[in-house]
Amino acid sequence: MSSLDDLIARAKLLLSEGHSPGQIADELSLSMETVTWLLTQANGGSAAPKDVHIDWTAVSSQAPLLDGIALMLLNRYYGAQKDPAAASADVIVGIALSGIPLATVISVQEAAQLAIYHPAKQNASEHPVGSISGNFAPVAKERCIIVDDVITSGNTMREVVKYLKKHGAVPVAIWVIFDKRGIRDIDGVPVYSLFKISRID
C-alpha cells in the first residue's frame, strides 16, 4: 500500500469512528481541501491537492520530547525579541487538539495561564463557530500567545486572532512547530515557527 493509500484509509477510518472532517484535518496535519479529497477519492479519480503530510507522533507522544520542543519554541521567540521582558504573555492559548499539550508545557515553563481554543472546523453544528473553553483561563484584557503544531492554510490562525481581538485580548505572537505556508504574520500578529515546510513541484 502506498503512503497515499495509507492516508486515504486512515482518513476514512477516522470518519467511520465519528471524527468530523475538521478533526481529521487536524489529526493528519492536512488542509480541509486535502481531507475532502481523501474522503471522496475513488481509484483513478482527480489529482490530489498539493499538500504535505507531517507525522510528528514520535515527538508528540513522548512528554520529554514535547518538553524539548516547547523549550525550542521559547528560545526561538525570546531570542528574536529586543526586549524579552516586554514580550511575555499572561495567557498561552492552545488550539485543540494538537496545540493543547504543547501549550500546557509552555504555560508551565512560562508560569502563565492556559486557555484552550476550539476551532469552528471541529464544531459539527450547522453554523460552526470557534470558542474559548470556559474550563480554562479567560482571555479578555490579557496578552496571549497562540500555540499549535502546524499552520496548514492559516485559516484557523486567522479565526483565533479575530476571536481573541473581538473578545478584548491582545494576541502578541503565534508559535508553531511547522509552517506550511511561510507566513510572517496573521493580521499583524507575528508567526514564530521552528520549521518552514515548502513543496517544490
Swiss-Prot record:
Pfam families in UniProt: Pribosyltran
GO biological process: one example: regulation of gene expression
Gene3D superfamilies listed in its UniProt record: 3.40.50.2020
UniProt keyword annotations, A-Z: DNA-binding, Transcription, Transcription regulation
Chain coiled-coil ranges: none
Gene Ontology MF terms: DNA binding; orotate phosphoribosyltransferase activity
HAMAP family, per the entry: GfcR (MF_01214)
UniProt domain comment: Contains an N-terminal DNA-binding winged helix-turn-helix domain and a C-terminal regulatory domain (or effector binding domain) resembling phosphoribosyltransferase (PRT) domain.
Family: Belongs to the purine/pyrimidine phosphoribosyltransferase family. GfcR subfamily.
Name assigned to this protein: Transcriptional regulator GfcR
